[in-house]
From Swiss-Prot:
Protein's gene: CHSJ
Lineage: Eukaryota, Viridiplantae, Streptophyta, Embryophyta, Tracheophyta
CDD domains linked: CHS_like
GO MF term list: naringenin-chalcone synthase activity
Family: Belongs to the thiolase-like superfamily. Chalcone/stilbene synthases family.
Protein known as: Chalcone synthase J
Keywords: Acyltransferase, Flavonoid biosynthesis, Transferase
Enzyme class, broadest EC rank: transferase
Originating species: Petunia hybrida (Petunia)
Record-linked Gene3D superfamilies: 3.40.47.10
Top-rank lineage group of the source organism: Eukaryota
Claim: Transport is one of the keywords in the record: no
Entry's EC annotation: 2.3.1.74
Length: 389
């Protein structure tokens, strides 16, 4: 007679969860940050608000973003004037866009990841889909399963309304799935479209304007599994540990509320200050078991909520400027894509490391950290181990 413990042992994988492929996708419509204020105030019929426009121009200039990608074109916005008007009822129009486009963009990224992985999609056992862009039932996970032609028995997990920390959350969940289910291959997809948050400017809601200056569209997909098949599957990064914490005294610092007007965005406290003040504690808890306390000796992937967060973290920890190079590059080229950002940064880092012949996928270093920051304030901390290139 077999025991429960024997069954459990047989179900568990041997090695750590490993990222084996990464794919990314953006809409084709690219917006230039330097000319965006002119376009934004024109399309929202707000050109008479000259002082506010100057303020927005300064926000865009300081954003360290060169360009962003957006599904919302001028044509779509002209067809849906309520999306442009500040606080006009527009949820139906927004939902009609995102319930179709979020899975579609996710499919593009997933196909690239599956192609790099090189295995038949029938070997995907689990799907984790994450978006802060709209909600629906059955969800974007179901739509993507259909779009990709995954097995009907694929085990799905749908994460809605998590926000900017969720790139860390999906890795934490995928790690547990891969390590506790022998042979599991988890497809993780984060897909974000700003059609839920786009709206015209208003003098009394400047935090909404911050969002208009920062957010961009993008989707990223990764394949995670334990015990990669030698010569068949290529490991990129190993997931060593993953934790989540709520920062003290940070309630209401970042809020989002789904209303008739779409998803409203609120910044109520000094977010960069709260994060930089507490980040050391998260690092110590994560790296003490490894005997690491020099934050310049590890590679860095931090959710680029905005340039101020990166600047203050850099200052607080005494990081060398090159530590956040991959993070700042993604912010500059794509803007803040919420949950998808950190996966874009992973992709950028492994590609740059290989191109520059740096020896490992983590800029030549062995150990690294991935941070997600978002509503709560919630911080996700993932310890990564790089792989020789």
């Amino acid at each position: 007679m077999v025991t429960v413990e024997e069954i459990r042992r047989a179900q568990r994988a041997e090695g750590p969860a490993t990222i084996m492929a990464i794919g990314t996708a953006t809409p084709s419509n690219c917006v230039d940050q330097s000319t965006y204020p002119d376009y934004y105030f024109r399309i929202t019929n707000s050109e008479h608000k000259t002082e506010l426009k100057e303020k927005f121009q300064r926000m865009c200039d300081k954003s360290m973003i060169k360009k962003r990608y957006m599904h919302l074109t001028e044509e779509i916005l002209k067809e849906n004037p309520n999306i442009c008007e500040y606080m006009a009822p527009s949820l139906d129009a927004r939902q009609d866009i995102v319930v179709v486009e979020v899975p579609k963009l996710g499919k593009e990224a997933a196909q690239k990841a599956i192609k790099e992985w090189g295995q038949p999609k029938s070997k995907i056992t689990h799907l984790v889909f994450c978006t802060t862009s709209g909600v629906d039932m059955p969800g974007a996970d179901y739509q993507l399963t259909k779009l990709l032609g995954l097995r009907s028995s694929v085990k799905r997990l749908m994460m809605y309304q998590q926000g900017c920390f969720a790139g860390g959350t999906v890795l934490r969940l995928a790690k547990d799935l891969a390590e506790n289910n022998k042979g599991a291959r988890v497809l993780v997809v984060c897909s974000e479209i700003t059609a839920v948050t786009f709206r015209g400017p208003n003098d009394t809601h400047l935090d909404s304007l911050v969002g208009q200056a920062l957010f961009g569209d993008g989707a990223a997909a990764i394949i995670i599994g334990s015990d990669p098949l030698p010569g068949v599957e290529r490991p990129l990064f190993e997931l060593v540990s993953a934790s989540q914490t709520l920062l003290p005294d940070s309630e209401g610092a970042i809020d989002g509320h789904l209303r008739e007007v779409g998803l409203t965005f609120h910044l109520l406290k000094d977010v960069p200050g709260l994060i930089s003040k507490n980040i050391q504690k998260s690092l110590v808890e994560a790296f003490q078991p490894l005997g690491i306390s020099d934050w310049n000796s590890i590679f860095w992937i931090a959710h680029p909520g905005g340039p101020a967060i990166l600047d203050q973290v850099e200052l607080k920890l005494g990081l060398k400027p090159e530590k956040l190079r991959a993070t700042r590059h993604v912010l500059s080229e794509y803007g803040n894509m919420s949950s998808a950002c950190v996966l874009f940064i992973l992709d950028e880092m492994r590609k740059a490391s290989s191109k520059e012949g740096l020896g490992t996928t983590g800029e030549g270093l062995e150990w690294g950290v991935l941070f997600g920051f978002g509503p709560g304030l919630t911080v996700e901390t993932v310890v990564l181990h790089s792989v020789s290139t």
